[in-house]
Amino acid sequence: MLQRKLGKRIAELRRARKLTQEQLAEAVGCSVEFISLVERGVNAPSVAGLETFSRALKVEVKELFAFEEKKR
């Protein structure tokens, strides 16, 4: 569940910066396939990878986890 929310947040931040998955992959130093897996919540970056994603997206690491919780 957290992995899925993180992936959606990364995709949201990427789109807000008008980056393609290819551009983000190049900035992060990974494959486009990995970016796709992360954004779909199938895979998650390592702790070190979170720092790399945050630099590429020009946000603090905590901003990667700034997603809204749904009220039940």
Q: What does each model-identified segment do?
A:
Residues 42-54, 71:
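Short, basic-rich loop-to-helix N-cap that marks the start of a DNA-contacting helix
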Residues 1-5, 70-72:
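A detector for short, charged/polar N-terminal pre-domain segments
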Residues 29-44:
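Recognition helix of helix-turn-helix/homeodomain-like DNA-binding domains
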Residues 40, 59, 69:
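Short, conserved catalytic or interaction motifs in soluble domains
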Residues 8-27, 52:
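Short basic helix-loop element that most often maps to the first helix and adjoining turn
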Residues 55, 63-72:
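Short, charged recognition helix plus adjacent turn
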Residues 10, 24-25, 35-38, 64:
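Conserved hydrophobic/aromatic packing and binding residues within compact polymer-binding modules
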